[in-house]
Design a protein with these regions (language model features):
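A short beta-strand element within beta-rich, extracytoplasmic domains
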Residues: 48-76, 124
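Extracellular carbohydrate recognition and processing domains
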Residues: 92-115
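Edge beta-strands of jelly-roll/beta-sandwich modules across compartments, strongly enriched
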Residues: 132-145
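Short beta-strand-plus-loop segments that form exposed binding edges in beta-rich domains
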Residues: 125-133
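Disordered, acidic Ser/Thr/Pro-rich linker "stalks" and the adjacent N-terminal cap
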Residues: 3-44
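Short, surface-exposed beta-strand/strand-loop-strand elements in extracellular ectodomains
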Residues: 78-89
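Extracellular beta-rich ligand/substrate-recognition surface
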Residues: 32-50, 98-102, 133
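Enriched but not universal
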Residues: 1-15, 19-20, 143-165
Length: 165
């Protein structure tokens, strides 16, 4: 079974806006993609960054660990670059730049190969840059998926018998 670390806190929102309400993380934390709520940022001549805390997951068994961001850019020129970074505290554990392929709603993903020691201290940084300053970047969903937790080792002890007379 898979575990999901989903946004559960707005750590630093910059100029990113929520489609409704004030919590950005609540717009993109759903387990099933919902394109009716989102976060967005417009007219970014320079990088616009949001940092989101992620929910805790148990230390996983070995297997593929993947960051997924469901996004769209509407510049009409495919000019928005989205940089996504998974961090443990302030240390980058993996990042990917996406500069094309999301001029329609798309799931952008990459695998994490670096080791992570504390799965309760993860955050996701998303930066959008449009050198033309004409586009809007939308993010509809974001999460980090990991395998199920490793099975606990069962320890057995030899039987102990006590006879009382």
């Amino acid at each position: 079974m898979t575990q999901y670390a989903r946004p559960d806190a707005d750590t630093s929102v910059g100029n990113w806006a929520a489609s409704s309400g004030s919590s950005r993380y609540a717009m993109i934390d759903e387990s099933s993609a919902d394109d009716s709520d989102y976060i967005s940022v417009s007219s970014m001549g320079s990088a616009e960054t949001i940092v989101l805390g992620l929910s805790d997951v148990d230390t996983p068994d070995s297997g593929t660990r993947t960051v997924v961001v469901r996004a769209y850019e509407d510049s009409g020129f495919n000019s928005v670059q989205l940089d996504v970074t998974l961090k443990e505290g302030s240390t980058s554990k993996g990042s990917q730049s996406f500069s094309s392929g999301f001029d329609s709603v798309a799931n952008l993903s990459f695998n994490i190969t670096s080791s992570i020691s504390d799965y309760s201290n993860l955050n996701l940084t998303i930066s959008a840059t449009d050198p033309m300053g004409m586009g809007t970047a939308y993010v509809y969903q974001a999460y980090f998926s990991v395998p199920d937790a490793a099975a606990e080792e069962v320890t057995t002890s030899p039987a102990f018998l006590l006879f009382v007379d």
